[in-house]
Amino acid sequence: MTTRGFSVSHADGVPFERGLRSFFEYRDLGIKAATDGRVVAHVIRAAAGAGFSSRPHRHETSFQLVCVLQGWIEFEYEGQGVVRLLAGSCVHQPPGIRHRELGHSADVEMLEIVMPGDFLTEEVAAVDDDVRAAAVIRAPTD
C-alpha cells in the first residue's frame, strides 16, 4: 500500500492569503503538492474591506468546479447569462468559458477545484459576443 499523495487539511491554524483575485482570500488545501501540480483545491472567501472589480476573463483549464459553502456569489457566463449560486450550489465551468463575477455576499465561502494546478487566466473584451442574448439563471430561493 502506498501513501504517496495522501493529504489532509484542517481549517484550524491554516491562514487565508490573497491570490488571483484581490477581493478574495484563498486557503490552500494541500492538493496541489499532493498531486504534483495536477490539481489545485482551495477554499475561497470574501476579503474583508476589499473593493470588488471583475473583468471578463477565461481560464486555460481542463476542469474547474466551484461549490458554494456559505453565502452567495453571482457570475455571468458565456452563452448562459447570469447565474446566482447559493450555499450548496455547484457549477462546472467548462474549459475556456468566458465569465466574470458580478457580486457576492460578505460571508461567501467556496470550494474550488481546478486542473491543472497552474493555469493561465486571460482577460477578454466581453463575456458574450452578444450580451443581449444572455439569459438569467437563478438558484431556487425556497
Task: Give the predicted meaning of each segment.
Residues 15-57, 62, 142:
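A short glycine-rich, His/Asp/Glu-containing loop-to-beta-strand
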Residues 43-46, 58-75, 113-116:
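Short, conserved beta-strand element in jelly-roll/cupin
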Residues 25, 97, 106:
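Residues that flank catalytic or metal-binding motifs in active/ligand-binding sites
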Residues 78-80, 103-104:
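Conserved catalytic-core motifs of eukaryotic protein kinase domains, centered on the activation segment
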Residues 1-2, 38:
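Extended interaction-bearing regions that mediate binding to partners or small molecules
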Residues 3-10, 17, 100-142:
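Double-stranded beta-helix
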Residues 43-45, 89, 99:
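Hydrophobic/aromatic beta-strand elements that line small-molecule binding cavities or substrate pockets
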Residues 79-96:
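Short acidic-glycine-tyrosine-enriched beta hairpin
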